[in-house]
Amino acid sequence: MEEKYHPSPDSPTEIPFHPAHASYLKSLVTQAGARDPSHLIFGADRHKYKLNPPASLEEVRRFEEKHNLLLPEEYKFFLTQIGNGGAGPYYGLYSLEEAERYTEYLETTQTAAKQKDEEVPAPAFIDRRMTPEDWAVRMEELDNCSDDEYDSLMYKLCAGMLVIGTQGCTYDTVLMCRGSERGKIVYIDWNLEPGYGPFFTGMPFLYWYEMYFQEILQDHNLTSYGYLCLKSEEEFVKDFCEMDKKTGEEDNNMDFPPLNKEQLLSSLFRFKTAAAETIDFLAALKEPELDAMRTELLFRFDLHRGREVFEQLLSGSNPDAAICCARRLP
């Protein structure tokens, strides 16, 4: 399948893998470092907005051959033209050498894992066709299997998956190299809970990388980068108002993964301030199941309006939501 670059509106070129774009991304890293000189943004004290020297094409090819993996073109462009790891979301990006430490279940396919004499690429398990039930069943299998069976199941689970960075604790950043999400970023919690599967950001690698630094330059909240959609305030209000008008057929044609109203509303936590129109929208919103979240957002953007809505909820319209909001406030 042909890979396509998804530029931001500020990108200098829409030509994939152009040298000008490599220069542009390096410039974004430098600008972000100047905006955060004390490295206060989460993870910045680790990578310090520094990129490693680029890898050679030969180094990339050796990595691919060793792991029977075809790396996405965007990622190869990054490695060879921008940097072999370094500055990036959360604690930054691993170099190919660092990524080697996390390839235990990548070095062989499910066939090679059993027979040690074949290398047939295994299909990606982490794929948009995977349902929450599929994930839960696989996790239950992992909990109730022998050591040999565990390794075999993990090879299947990790097929086509390359860990390229960490968010801390048990959360890692994964670049998918096979399946529907090839070239896109997925977040995974290695606690491997049956009820909590991988998070599909839906973002191609270069877009995910670029927008992280754009968010820094726009002084947005980076706490949950990649988990929250990167819409503007205007786009958010427009899309939210149109959600009730969409048919099931239209939902099926949406970019993956589709968002529900709660997920869309939560995207506003990226912003430290909001326009008067956004504040008015939140104050007037009539969605009882979203009352706690919209009130928390109002407290963030306009303390007076937040207090007004909070008192309305507490006095009778939705006291449970008011209590929930109070518990979530710092």
Please report, for each region that a protein language model flagged, where it lies by residue:
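Short, flexible helical or helix-coil boundary motifs
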Residues: M1, A32-D36, A113, I216, ...
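Long, contiguous interaction/recruitment modules in multidomain scaffold/adaptor proteins
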Residues: W135-G248
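Amphipathic alpha-helical scaffolding segments comprising HEAT/armadillo-like alpha-solenoid repeats
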Residues: M243-N252, T273-L285, L303-S315
